[in-house]
Design a protein with these regions (language model features):
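Conserved MFS/SLC helix-loop-helix module at the cytosolic interface between two early adjacent transmembrane helices
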Residues: 50-89
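Flexible cytoplasmic inter-helical loops of multi-pass small-molecule transporters
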Residues: 176-195
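Cytoplasmic helix-loop-helix junction between adjacent transmembrane helices
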Residues: 94-132
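Small-residue-rich segments within alpha-helical transmembrane domains of MFS-like 12-TM solute carriers
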Residues: 13, 17, 83, 99-107, ...
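Helical-face signature of the major facilitator-like transporter fold
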Residues: 5-13, 45, 79, 87-99
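Residue-level signature of mid-helix packing/kink "hotspots" within the transmembrane helices
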Residues: 17, 45-53, 137-138
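Extracytoplasmic
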Residues: 1-34
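Helix-loop-helix hairpin linking two adjacent transmembrane segments in secondary transporters
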Residues: 129-180
Length: 195
């Protein structure tokens, strides 16, 4: 189950790194100078940073399933707005939405890992989640550059938005906050189980 949210973490890394590969396209399509391009890229980070404290509160209040599903939907919307928006303002909004939504992935992933895996596997699962995240960064390198050369940046980013929408649906249908919801043993600390 944590793998679904780890996939959102991967998407977040991809979205974080992608502007470096498509910088020339963004500058051309939106008539940007270097400062404006920096601001466009920074929208992701402004939102990401602002969501760190609320993320912990949200995952504790509404649960990993709801939070991850909503985050995937918002990320998909943000990516699609960024991909197909005709103005710089829309691109800013899209990047901000992406940053705010993918910011929940890491904390949510760790919350799920604490419920779905025994304590002696937590470090391994954490490492695997980091690996998935970094794969997103790798995909935003040469693979994205090749895709952009073949299909254009808007199409490549649009495809990533569509895939994120699919992830939202799968997350809502398959993810459960705790293995006990599927009849399996929970690995959550007893304090959390009795809460």
């Amino acid at each position: 189950m944590w793998g679904l949210v780890a996939t959102l973490y991967c998407i977040g890394f991809f979205q974080r790194m992608a502007p470096a590969v498509i910088a020339d396209d963004l500058m051309r399509d939106f008539s940007l100078d270097g400062v404006m391009l920096g601001n466009l890229s920074a929208m992701y980070f402004y939102a990401y940073a602002a969501m760190q404290i609320p993320t912990g509160l949200l995952v504790d209040q509404i649960g990993a399933r709801r939070l991850a599903s909503i985050a995937c939907l918002i990320a998909a919307a943000g990516i699609l707005i960024f991909s197909f928006g005709s103005s710089l303002w829309l691109a800013y909004v899209g990047r901000f939405l992406v940053g705010a939504s993918v910011a929940v992935a890491w904390v949510t992933c760790m919350k799920l890992a604490g419920h779905w895996f025994p304590a002696n596997r937590f470090a391994t699962v954490t490492g695997m989640a980091l690996l998935l995240g970094n794969l997103g960064g790798i995909m935003a390198g040469v693979p994205l550059a090749v895709g952009v050369d073949l299909f254009g940046w808007r199409m490549m980013m649009g495809v990533s938005g569509f895939l994120t929408l699919v992830l939202a649906i799968v997350t809502w249908l398959a993810l459960r906050d705790d293995p006990s919801e599927y009849g399996y043993r929970s690995h959550a600390p007893l304090v959390v189980q009795n809460h």
